A protein has these predicted regions:
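Acidic/polar surface patches and capping/hinge elements
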Residues: 1-275
Length: 275
């Protein structure tokens, strides 16, 4: 053939185009997630579409068929997302108050927002969101047992441990804290693990199929782990260490949700197991 492609030759048939399938799926999902950026999304889709054709990798009908396929698959995810209960995860003041009352009834110190001014807790009903890989009954079954009582010797020892570390910060400890802080305006803990995964995948020269599959596995695990974690947090409504000892001054901001169980640890455990 006299045609010379401008990208590496693929060993796969050209119809339907893999690039087209990616475009179709990505556009549908991005439209859901970023409704205010429709023009930008369509602009990038057109760039990707043209690149597939002008590179010599695919003819137009290859790309169009791939797009239609990707779009139809993504629409199933969009339909699921609209009914997964994430839209109700913020709850309301009566529900937040009920969680606090339950903790008090158990004789425990309830969590409260340490932000000034106080803000509503972060997605207190996210534990009710529909998981990808199991049902809501399994969320309850996976819920860990209770934390040590705030009145227990164990909790006193663990609070002292934190205070001693905070009171004697080292350069190494501070560096670790800032690397994993993942606060507002960052990729957050779950996105941090996506970044770690992406850097590793690049070194292995994975195909687009392996990239898509690996990210799907990783992020479904992160999502479902988050659901169980948030169910646990707001079931026990456990206070932050700074509530138990006012001398504890954190090296980063204090998250606006209960302490037990740790969200960072949950995300890290799920991601490390998958990777």
């Amino acid at each position: 053939s006299s045609l010379k492609v401008m990208v590496p030759k693929s060993t796969l048939p050209s119809y339907p185009s893999t690039e087209g399938a990616v475009i179709g799926a990505a556009v549908e999902m991005m439209k859901l997630l970023f409704p205010g950026d429709q023009e930008f999304i369509q602009q990038k889709a057109e760039e990707h579409r043209r690149a597939s054709i002008i590179s010599g990798a695919n003819v137009r009908s290859d790309v169009e068929a791939g797009e239609a396929l990707g779009r139809s698959v993504a629409q199933k995810f969009v339909a699921r997302a609209r009914t997964d209960r994430a839209g109700q995860a913020g709850g309301n003041p009566a529900q937040w108050s009920s969680m606090e009352d339950t903790a008090i009834t158990k004789g425990e110190t309830p969590w409260y927002s340490l932000e000034l001014p106080k803000r509503p807790p972060m997605l207190p009903l996210f534990g009710k969101v529909k998981p990808f890989l199991f049902d809501s009954a399994t969320v309850v079954a996976l819920r860990p047992g209770p934390p040590p009582s705030v009145h227990s010797e164990q909790m006193k020892k663990e609070t002292v441990e934190i205070y001693e570390m905070i009171a004697n910060p080292t350069r190494e400890r501070t560096g670790i804290v800032h690397f994993w802080a993942d606060g507002v305006g960052t990729s957050t803990p779950s996105g941090h693990w996506d970044d770690i995964a992406a850097k590793d995948f690049l070194t292995k020269n994975y195909s687009e199929i392996r990239w898509a599959r690996n990210f799907a596995l990783l992020n479904m695990a992160l999502n479902d782990a988050a659901i169980v974690c948030w169910d646990t947090k707001f079931y026990y409504f456990n206070p932050r260490p700074t509530q138990l000892n006012a001398r504890i001054k954190t090296l980063t901001g204090i998250p606006n949700f209960p302490a037990y169980i740790s969200g960072h640890s949950t995300f890290s455990g799920a991601a490390a197991a998958i990777l």
